[in-house]
């Protein structure tokens, strides 16, 4: 194992009865990395997290932590802690005692416990809350206590199972940035589980997209968003226009009965492909100047942009633009070569 790799999953599978929840999973996580498992309900992301934590055992394959298999190592003997969506705080203990709990189990000196707890409460911006009851805290404050309690034991890996799911939208956005900031300050590896694409794109160094127990794509947020590997990823990560196309030859693709310049190479001549164009990458121009033109069938204001639907021949295009257009207007559409993404058609189960 390379020095910067903390944990590696090799051919890991998990079955419930005859059904695979995770099948032949291969990936590694680097030290100090923020990695996110992203996918719909039932994709296997929480099961994978539970196998890493030790709450579940793989039926096949190996989980390697710092060069040693931990398949049968019990959870309390792994240098791994977990924060759950339901924070599982001890309501009969105040904030200080909740955070100190793991250190007391280790029977550390009281002076050391106090120093470590104070350091963690300062890190999560809860200094002065030591004597507060956990029941008196807001959801965001309870979240911080749970994170401090998990981190005070100095794990090498922190697992977070949809910990922001119970928070309101504003607080969730704040906590996304705060979690990333904590991870960077401490230099600890985080593995985060979510079905929320925005959370994954905002916080992660690496995203693992899962569907029905198999990896669809592993990459940076930019790679996952801009260069989806298949139709499932393109549909799951944000809004996309996905069309049937034909790759005529390198740098030329045909869709919607028009030929476009693109930047893709390596396809067979006249190969059937899927074409992905993000709504924000479509330019609205005059009907005469557009490569495509059509009629506006809806225009809804979304706050930062209008979501516009345009009927072009037999295709309904979705466009995000700050320009106001009216239903019934005839407009032109233009797409730059860099904004056309070509994917090979794959025989995969793409339904979430």
From Swiss-Prot:
EC numbers for this chain: 7.6.2.11
Main location: membrane
InterPro entries attached to this UniProt entry: AAA+_ATPase, ABC_SmlMolc_Importer, ABC_transporter-like_ATP-bd, ABC_transporter-like_CS, Mo/tungstate-bd_C_term_dom, NA-bd_OB-fold, P-loop_NTPase, PotA-like
SUPFAM superfamilies named among the record's database cross-references: MOP-like, P-loop containing nucleoside triphosphate hydrolases
Reaction(s) the record says it catalyses: ATP + H2O + polyamine-[polyamine-binding protein]Side 1 = ADP + phosphate + polyamineSide 2 + [polyamine-binding protein]Side 1
Pfam families reported for this sequence: ABC_tran, TOBE_2
PROSITE patterns per UniProt: ABC_TRANSPORTER_1, ABC_TRANSPORTER_2, POTA
GO CC list: ATP-binding cassette (ABC) transporter complex
Cell compartments where the protein resides: Cell membrane
GO molecular function, one term: ATP binding
The entry's keywords: ATP-binding, Cell membrane, Membrane, Nucleotide-binding, Translocase, Transport
Bilayer disposition of the protein: Peripheral membrane protein
Sections of the chain in a coiled coil: none
Binding positions (ATP): 39-46
Ranges of residues in domain ABC transporter: 7-237
Described function: Part of the ABC transporter complex PotABCD involved in spermidine/putrescine import. Responsible for energy coupling to the transport system.
Subunit note: The complex is composed of two ATP-binding proteins (PotA), two transmembrane proteins (PotB and PotC) and a solute-binding protein (PotD).
Matching NCBIfam families: MMSYN1_0197 (NF043075), potA (TIGR01187)
Membership in a protein family: Belongs to the ABC transporter superfamily. Spermidine/putrescine importer (TC 3.A.1.11.1) family.
Stated name of the protein: Spermidine/putrescine import ATP-binding protein PotA
């Amino acid at each position: 194992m390379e020095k910067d790799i903390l944990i590696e999953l090799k051919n890991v599978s998990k079955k419930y009865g005859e059904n695979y929840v995770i099948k032949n999973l291969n990936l590694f996580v680097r030290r100090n990395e923020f990695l996110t498992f992203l996918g719909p309900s039932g994709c296997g992301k929480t099961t994978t997290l539970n196998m890493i934590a030790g709450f579940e055992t793989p039926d096949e394959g190996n989980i390697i932590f710092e060069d040693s298999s931990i398949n049968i190592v019990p959870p309390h003997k792994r240098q791994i802690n977990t924060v759950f969506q339901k924070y599982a705080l001890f309501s009969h203990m105040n904030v200080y005692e909740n955070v100190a709990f793991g250190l007391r189990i280790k029977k550390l000196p009281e002076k050391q416990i106090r120093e470590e707890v104070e350091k963690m409460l300062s890190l999560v911006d809860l200094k002065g809350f030591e004597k507060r009851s956990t029941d008196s805290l807001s959801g965001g404050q309870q979240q911080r206590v749970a994170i401090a309690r998990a981190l005070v034991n100095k794990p090498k890996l922190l697992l977070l199972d949809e910990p922001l799911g119970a928070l309101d939208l504003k607080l969730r956005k704040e906590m996304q940035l705060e979690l990333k900031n904590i991870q960077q300050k401490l230099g600890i590896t985080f593995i985060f589980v979510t079905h929320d694409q925005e959370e994954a794109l905002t916080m992660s160094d690496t995203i693992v997209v899962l569907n029905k127990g198999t990896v669809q794509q592993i990459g940076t947020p930019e790679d996952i968003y801009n260069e989806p590997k298949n139709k499932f990823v393109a549909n799951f990560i944000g809004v996309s226009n996905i069309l049937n196309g034909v790759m005529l030859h390198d740098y030329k693709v045909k869709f919607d009965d028009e030929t476009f310049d693109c930047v893709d190479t390596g396809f067979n001549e006249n190969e059937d492909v899927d074409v992905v164009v993000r709504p924000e990458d479509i330019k609205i121009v005059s009907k005469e100047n557009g490569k495509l033109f059509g009629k506006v069938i809806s225009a809804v204001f979304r706050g930062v942009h209008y979501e516009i639907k345009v009927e072009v021949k037999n295709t309904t295009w979705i466009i995000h633009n700050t320009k106001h257009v009216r239903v019934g207007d005839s407009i032109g559409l233009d797409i730059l070569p860099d904004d056309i993404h070509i994917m090979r058609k794959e025989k995969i189960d793409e339904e979430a």
